[in-house]
Amino acid sequence: MVALKGIPKVLSPELLFALARMGHGDEIVLADANFPTSSICQCGPVEIRADGLDIPQLLEAVLRLLPLDTYVESPAAVMDLVPSDKEKGLQTPIWKRYESLLLEADCKKTLMKLERFEFYERAKKAFAVVATGEMALYGNIILKKGTLDLGPS
């Protein structure tokens, strides 16, 4: 927990440090409980633990601080359903929640859907992967950091 004004209490010091160190175009993965976080992080991303937290509450807090990239097709991506789950008609209600939170953060672009192994490869190049306790299937989301318009100096 962080004892600072205006900082959501779900953001750990490690996560705040990672968000501050990220530059324009860097990505962070908010990973569900089934995601192979430790394996992916062996390829380079910083591993941050947020066990017990759901992704929507963490996403809401992160979006209060993290500017999203406006120069890309979509600054947010999820793992698309595998063909067998599509055939079964599996629903992903968590994506609607993500879209709502992104809209509240002034992101009007739609969620990009990445094929499973494409998502894993992109996660390997992320700045950090945050392991959460999210139990929803297909709950992983990648966010691309944008820039702040600080006006004239």
From Swiss-Prot:
Known tissue expression: Widely expressed in various tissues and cell lines, including kidney, liver, and pancreas, marginally in muscle and testis.
Enzyme class: isomerase
Top-level lineage group: Eukaryota
Active site: H24, D69, Y120
A cellular component term, taken from the record's GO annotations: cytosol
Entries under SUPFAM superfamilies matching the protein: RbsD-like
The entry's keywords: Isomerase
Classification via Pfam families: RbsD_FucU
Gene3D superfamilies to which the protein is assigned, alphabetical: RbsD-like domain
Annotated positions binding substrate: D32, M79, Y120, Y138, N140
Key word Protein biosynthesis present: no
EC number: 5.1.3.29
Effect of a null allele: Deficient female mice show reduced sexual receptivity, as measured by lordosis quotient and masculinized sexual behaviors in female mice. Display a reduced number of tyrosine hydroxylase-positive neurons in the anteroventral periventricular nucleus, a sexually dimorphic feature in rats and mice. Embryos at 16.5 dpc have reduced alpha-feto-protein levels and reduced fucosylation of alpha-feto-protein.
GO biological process: female mating behavior; fucose metabolic process; fucosylation; GDP-L-fucose salvage; negative regulation of neuron differentiation; neuron differentiation
Listed pathway(s): Carbohydrate metabolism; L-fucose metabolism
Catalytic activity, reaction form: alpha-L-fucose = beta-L-fucose
Gene Ontology MF terms: fucose binding; L-fucose mutarotase activity; racemase and epimerase activity, acting on carbohydrates and derivatives
InterPro entries: RbsD-like_sf, RbsD/FucU_mutarotase, RbsD_FucU
SUBUNIT field: Mainly homodimer, but also exists as homotetramer, homooctamer, and homodecamer. The homodimeric form seems catalytically inactive.
UniProt family annotation: Belongs to the RbsD / FucU family.
Role description: Involved in the interconversion between alpha- and beta-L-fucoses. L-Fucose (6-deoxy-L-galactose) exists as alpha-L-fucose (29.5%) and beta-L-fucose (70.5%), the beta-form is metabolized through the salvage pathway. GDP-L-fucose formed either by the de novo or salvage pathways is transported into the endoplasmic reticulum, where it serves as a substrate for N- and O-glycosylations by fucosyltransferases. Fucosylated structures expressed on cell surfaces or secreted in biological fluids are believed to play a critical role in cell-cell adhesion and recognition processes.
Name listed for the protein in its UniProt record: Fucose mutarotase
Organism the protein comes from: Mus musculus
